[in-house]
UniProtKB/Swiss-Prot annotation:
GO terms for molecular function: enzyme inhibitor activity; nutrient reservoir activity. InterPro entries: Apo-VLDL-II. Monomer. This is Apovitellenin-1.
C-alpha cells in the first residue's frame, strides 16, 4: 500500500506502546518502581496532558488528511488532466 492509502492514525498508538514497554521492563526489575510509574501515570496532570495531546494530534491528523486529499485532487485534475 502507498502512504496515502494506509491508516494514518496508526502512529497515534506509538507513545502508548513506548510507555507500556518501559513500564513492563521496569516492573520486571522492580515491582515497587513499576507501581510508582503506574500511579504516576494516573495523576491528574499526566492524564490531562495525555488527553490534550491526543485531542490535538487528532485535529492535526484530520487536517493532514484533508490536505492530502486536496493535493491528490490537484494532482489528478491539474497534472494528469483527469
Amino acid at each position: 500500500k502507498s502512504i496515502f492509502e494506509r491508516d494514518r492514525r496508526d502512529w497515534l498508538v506509538i507513545p502508548d506502546a513506548i510507555a507500556a514497554y518501559i513500564y513492563e521492563t521496569v516492573n520486571k526489575m522492580s515491582p515497587r518502581v513499576g507501581q510508582f510509574l503506574a500511579d504516576a501515570a494516573q495523576t491528574p496532570v499526566v492524564v490531562g496532558t495525555r488527553t490534550f495531546l491526543i485531542r490535538e494530534t487528532s485535529k492535526l491528523t484530520l487536517l493532514a488528511e484533508q490536505l492530502m486529499e486536496k493535493i491528490k485532487n490537484l494532482w489528478y485534475t491539474k497534472v494528469l488532466g483527469y
